[in-house]
Amino acid sequence: MILLHFVYSLWALLLIPLTNAEEFTPKVTKTIAQDSFDILSFDDSNTLIRKQDTSVTISFDDGETWEKVEGIEGEITWIYIDPFNRHDRAVATAMNGSYLYITNDQGKSWERITLPDSGESISPRECYIETHPLNKNYFLAKCNYCEKTEVNNDNEENSGDEEGQFEIFNITRCTDKVFASNDGGKSFSEIKSSLERNENSPISISDCGFAKTSKDSDLESSDTSIICLFQNMQLIMDEFSSPYTESKLVLTTDWGKSLKEFDQFKDKVVNGYRILKSHMVVLTQGDRYNDMSSMDVWVSNDLSNFKMAYMPTQLRHSMQGEIYEDAMGRIILPMSRERSDQEEDKGIVSEILISDSQGLKFSPIPWTANEVFGYINFYQPTYLKGTMIASLYPLSRRRNRKGKAKGVKSKGVTKISVDNGLTWTMLKVVDPDNADSFDCDITDFENCSLQNMFYTREGSTPTAGILMTTGIVGDGSVFDWGDQRTFISRDGGLTWKLAFDFPCLYAVGDYGNVIVAIPYNADEDDDPQSEFYYSLDQGKTWTEYQLETTIYPNEVMNTTPDGSGAKFILNGFTLAHMDGTTNFIYAIDFSTAFNDKTCEENDFEDWNLAEGKCVNGVKYKIRRRKQDAQCLVKKVFEDLQLFETACDKCTEADYECAFEFVRDATGKCVPDYNLIVLSDVCDKTKKKTVPVKPLQLVKGDKCKKPMTVKSVDISCEGVPKKGTNDKEIVVTENKFDFKIQFYQYFDTVTDESLLMINSRGEAYISHDGGQTIKRFDSNGETIIEVVFNPYYNSSAYLFGSKGSIFSTHDRGYSFMTAKLPEARQLGMPLDFNAKAQDTFIYYGGKNCESILSPECHAVAYLTNDGGETFTEMLDNAIHCEFAGSLFKYPSNEDMVMCQVKEKSSQTRSLVSSTDFFQDDKNTVFENIIGYLSTGGYIIVAVPHENNELRAYVTIDGTEFAEAKFPYDEDVGKQEAFTILESEKGSIFLHLATNLVPGRDFGNLLKSNSNGTSFVTLEHAVNRNTFGYVDFEKIQGLEGIILTNIVSNSDKVAENKEDKQLKTKITFNEGSDWNFLKPPKRDSEGKKFSCSSKSLDECSLHLHGYTERKDIRDTYSSGSALGMMFGVGNVGPNLLPYKECSTFFTTDGGETWAEVKKTPHQWEYGDHGGILVLVPENSETDSISYSTDFGKTWKDYKFCADKVLVKDITTVPRDSALRFLLFGEAADIGGSSFRTYTIDFRNIFERQCDFDITGKESADYKYSPLGSKSNCLFGHQTEFLRKTDENCFIGNIPLSEFSRNIKNCSCTRQDFECDYNFYKANDGTCKLVKGLSPANAADVCKKEPDLIEYFESSGYRKIPLSTCEGGLKLDAPSSPHACPGKEKEFKEKYSVSAGPFAFIFISILLIIFFAAWFVYDRGIRRNGGFARFGEIRLGDDGLIENNNTDRVVNNIVKSGFYVFSNIGSLLQHTKTNIAHAISKIRGRFGNRTGPSYSSLIHDQFLDEADDLLAGHDEDANDLSSFMDQGSNFEIEEDDVPTLEEEHTSYTDQPTTTDVPDTLPEGNEENIDRPDSTAPSNENQ
């Protein structure tokens, strides 16, 4: 019994601590305050401070009691603890910013620091202090001043003359000022910006910082070294709305008295910098005129020498403030995603790049590199060496809308690494007690693990491996806020257990032995009051503490930042009143837990980081309290101690790949050709190979015995040497086991995003021009179609094989997934509203068990919310257009037009509606072949009798007019026509005249401004069976068109010969045509074999549109003005493609040069500043490039093995310096598809200096396009062009900058023939035989406000021409009154009789008085008229009494001589004519009638009257077209010579460009009903 009693007593004694623990209740003290947030702790103290409304309050007892700080005046906007003096210093900033308060004794006393007068007219908006890690007296005060101002946009010098000028924003004017102090704020001196600021720079930034940012800084710098970045920004308004930036990065060591600029960045735009422990990182903007351009990263460890780091992708939106350095000296570089229009997506981290230990080679987290694009959470606790936790979530999942996400399985994933990222594992849930509460098998770690979502630094308080987080257990496919729970880990994050079924805020104390958690939602426990939970056994058990109020928790924190204390602050708020919040601040004290017991030695255990493995050459361990120990550590204000033991042997984990090597799929370091090019290993040898060690010891690794690393021989063949431009070219290669079937760029300047589809129907996205390519997760659906929105450049739609539609409005960064209507996909393209991004029409098949089912028919479905919901709009519709959004002046903005084909009918009708066919439905045409829209017109093809077509045109959707084609002798039935382009108020159309397959050709036509009246520009223009035409309008230049004609069209039509093609060019939009002038010598300096001076026999011919593999590969580029490439030959006709060479022009086609002997593919970059050629249809390992506009060419080897390049491409604007090659190479076991991204950014020394007002500068000059200053469209134009080949242009719309030197006199080239007139071989416009001019009075019907009209002269002025004076070939006839407007017409031209009669009578009276005076004084008193015959010169018989008499007599004598000479001349002429007639009759006998010689241009004006006599109806009376007061002489430059130009005056017409609205081609074809042409023609 005694023994039993003893055991019972002992058990009772052991139970006492546990009972005390269970019964323990923390001390909770409540404080109520108004608008109080951000409670701050002084390190190693019991003092807290917080801002309450606009004042500062302080607590000296861990938050139990608070008092207002006395001595602080004014309104306080911000308080913060000095990061380098956390124990005792804090700063409070005032609202007006001209002063602040500082404490150096934990808030007991505050000193007011007054900042110096900045010289600005206003007080600073805000100021804050930056301190020094080593010297408490060193301050940098940074202040921001803003005031609203109006920026003057006017530029009198340039106004009206130069086009494309930028407009400066009116914006708030802001300036940064930096003041430095070395005496604790007693005095300051300003560090003034070294940039001059002008009135157009509304933003001036000064960002300065001490070069030492930590007490253990490794940077080689003095304590007084200060780095400053000065920037001036000018916001420019163009279509990109992008700021222009100039910058200077400087160093000062004397507090701003002298500034030393970093030479390496003098010609660069520094976007930002970051000073780390052992590195300084500088980010430079690739393009100063595009703040969204890619950036380069420069790294230095001595503030003197900077090296450019290698980036695996484009860095565009770095989060500079988040760049930091880990314990191994590696730079962690977060990249934010593009600036989305979606507010919730802004500022989200999208990718984490980690450098090697040298800071020079960056790479992404390995398991995220090839996954779908998403956003990343990244956390690296400094007290857990080598530990990283990262979460990746695809943005496609984030953008799913409610009710539409059921079928979406886009998976996110969270992983952890405990060895510095060498290996990664899932966050394992090891919790058998709660296994049944999860929806998946937690023992299957790969498919059931903890997924973390939020970008927060969980567990930032140091603990011995005890972490908490919120998340969801699953495979990552479902993640919703309501599903989150709270989890805890005791092994540094490797395994986790469930803590709560709801998400919580949490904090830890006593090194993790005390944990406090509070639910975000007070209703989690089914009562309205809030509560918090606490654990005293490292999360094993939890106790609830009930609060009496419902609060929204804002923060919970340990009062000791090092996590050593056991006191906490909980700050929550309620929305008690409209003006602000009521805060409830709870001080929670656990210091007396376990009866105030302090842990002893046997209460502790060792916990090993990374499961005891070596990390950084060291094994780490922490002494921590055992989980069930009934005590607290109570080492308040002592930092958590980490014990380390160096590892004896180094392993591969202690090494990283050398710069020239990358890890392959197996983790082995293998040579990378592109990195070898960037390094200098081959610069030091002349041998073909060089030995290099593939591994290097990680900087800072502490393992004792290094490994033996064997060198690998690297090939140096083809590697450029240092000092050459080729050394700076960066190539990135990607290999695939599939072929890319489709690709297309998004046409924006934000980045170089493109979408690709492979042969398996998988979609891939790249945002850096193909450098990195990531697969799009389509949830297992094959992508069967891709549609880009032609009106919104960031939008595209992907169709899945299972009925899903994936839409993106941010160039593929995020996708919204929706289900298409329950209808069969017919493969018809979407039709978009030009003015509403989310509105489009989808076509699906209804009742289509089979596509051949009798009841299967098409239905047009309408969506107004981007595909979230669809409604049936119209049955049997196969093509609709939002007509109201297309017209400039629509009759109704909501009008929709649809082509309808009833199942029971073989015809198609055109219907319209203004309410999406709910109640309004109007039949426009009952029977059509098809219709299309282009350039503000809608053109409808209507069948006519005898299998002909007729075209009708509308410009408002209501009024349709028949398109009148010219009557011509060689035009038969109108069986097929192709709409080529509509621009500048005219439609270009190809009317087929021969439709025999393989022998197709036709006439090129051009319309008037409303598209209803066409004239022939050129005959026998080549087309193919698909309706495509050899026609291309040169981009960026007015009126230049290239076309191929069938020179032997008559014999081709008779089936006697195959086509023989010739290339023609026009410089005035088809009015006149010439053959291309051939170069005199080829690319080898040899003369061409054909040497005829006649261009008809020897000219340059180019392969055209009908032969292209990719119709996007045009001759020209809209940004490279005047430049064109083409594959062709010099000779009488065009030769087969393989026999041709590559030619180039820089003056819009006036002169050409051969650049390559074989066919090459080409691409333009940097607005023509970089040109690239690659062989076509032959394997190669090199490209040719030019940086001097094609004058010289260099070859560059871009890969080690030869590949067959399928295509070369770049961004649609041709403004980038990066090109993408698609190639195919033979590999063992088959072929592999490859892409090569070739980056030329670094070959240029600098960016060209551009004046945003368009003025000339050292790098840009205005010059004419060609070799002569010819007039084109009635004016002489000069274009702004780069003059220095060593600089690059960048994001400047250079093609928009031009200026008109003068308007020229009108010449024949400024006119074209009017309707029913044709251009004869002599260049004149003649009326078609048997026809009359068009009824000129029709214009009155179209324009009811007109009161008069004019008859046609046969000519009309080309719409683009601005000529003045000169020829008036389109001079109107006398005006005629419009029908019904006779009264107004008379009022306009009638003249009042009163004033006219007065003037007339006055003139008559003056004449009569003068005549009577002369007669009376000079004739009558001198003898009258009888004496006329007696007057002789010098006769002194006349009466002359005064000067008046002498003047009158002289007048009389002069009159006498004039009249007598006229009489004599008439008599003499009569006699000579009689003699001449007699001689002619005798010599020529019976020959009668005039004889005319052939007219050439030099004779045009001189012989016009003779030539055109008797042909007034042909509009050839030039005398009425000339300005009576003008000089009619035509200069030599204005009139071509017969030898050069006469061949252009044929009876053949011209061709036109491809409409921009078509996704694949720029041509639309409308054919006859019985045509055999393929389906891309409207039949």
Curated annotation (Swiss-Prot):
One of its GO terms (cellular component) is cytosol. Keywords: Glycoprotein, Golgi apparatus, Membrane, Nucleotide-binding, Protein transport, Receptor, Repeat, Signal, Transmembrane, Transmembrane helix, Transport. Residues 22-1397 are lumenal. Residues 1-21 form the signal peptide. The keyword Nucleotide-binding applies. Glycans are attached at N96, N170, N447, N793, N1010, N1303. The chain crosses the membrane at residues 1398-1414. Pfam families: Sortilin-Vps10, Sortilin_C. GO terms for biological process: Golgi to endosome transport; Golgi to vacuole transport; mitophagy; pexophagy; protein targeting to vacuole; vacuolar transport; vesicle targeting, trans-Golgi to endosome. InterPro entries: Sialidase_sf, Sortilin_C, Sortilin_N, VPS10, VPS10-sortilin, WD40/YVTN_repeat-like_dom_sf. It comes from the Eukaryota. One of its GO terms (molecular function) is vacuolar sorting signal binding. The keyword Nucleus does not apply. It is found in: Golgi apparatus, trans-Golgi network membrane; Prevacuolar compartment membrane. Residues 1415-1579 are cytoplasmic. Residues 1533-1579 are annotated as: Disordered. The lumenal domain contains two regions of approximately 650 AA that exhibit 20% identity. The cytoplasmic domain serves as a Golgi retention/recycling signal. Present with 7210 molecules/cell in log phase SD medium. This is Vacuolar protein sorting/targeting protein VPS10.
